[in-house]
UniProtKB/Swiss-Prot annotation:
Protein modification: Phosphorylated on serine and tyrosine residues. CAV1 promotes phosphorylation on Ser-23 which then targets the complex to the plasma membrane, lipid rafts and caveolae. Phosphorylation on Ser-36 appears to modulate mitosis in endothelial cells. Phosphorylation on both Tyr-19 and Tyr-27 is required for insulin-induced 'Ser-727' phosphorylation of STAT3 and its activation. Phosphorylation on Tyr-19 is required for insulin-induced phosphorylation of MAPK1 and DNA binding of STAT3. Tyrosine phosphorylation is induced by both EGF and insulin (By. similarity).
Stretches of the chain forming a coiled coil according to its record: none
Organism superkingdom: Eukaryota
Organism: Gorilla gorilla gorilla (Western lowland gorilla)
PROSITE patterns, per database record: CAVEOLIN
Chain's role: May act as a scaffolding protein within caveolar membranes. Interacts directly with G-protein alpha subunits and can functionally regulate their activity. Acts as an accessory protein in conjunction with CAV1 in targeting to lipid rafts and driving caveolae formation. The Ser-36 phosphorylated form has a role in modulating mitosis in endothelial cells. Positive regulator of cellular mitogenesis of the MAPK signaling pathway. Required for the insulin-stimulated nuclear translocation and activation of MAPK1 and STAT3, and the subsequent regulation of cell cycle progression.
Official protein name in the record: Caveolin-2
Family in the record: Belongs to the caveolin family.
Membrane topology: Peripheral membrane protein
Modification type Phosphoserine: residues: 20, 23, 36
Gene this chain is encoded by: CAV2
Amino acid sequence: MGLETEKADVQLFMDDDSYSHHSGLEYADPEKFADSGQDRDPHRLNSHLKLGFEDVIAEPVTTHSFDKVWICSHALFEISKYVMYKFLTVFLAIPLAFIAGILFATLSCLHIWILMPFVKTCLMVLPSVQTIWKSVTDVIIAPLCTSVGRCFSSVSLQLSQD
């Protein structure tokens, strides 16, 4: 009655001498073909979204509902999750992909044509700015700070309690 979402795990164990390595056949890696569909999350960005019925609804050992209620609620959960996801992706995926494409294209253009030339220009100009700043510091700021320091070096405070 419920929607089956689990895949059966089948493994075949053979000794190395049970088949010939020189038979001309290439044996496929079973992990590559565990799912016949295309991997739409190759970098595992959404691996934390594996949400199942047992993750949302759980009955403790001491209290259980009827088996038919549990099976029907599990089936309804899976079907509604499937249908709502498909419904939302039909109406939101294309507009959001369009907006994300425009956003990333704009950011790429700004980075390539404005930000990086500005940074490179600043890096080219910085050595001369550094020389000018060092001269201004040595000529104006250093003597001023030295004079203020000498003025305040003769100040002494004495605290007396009355």
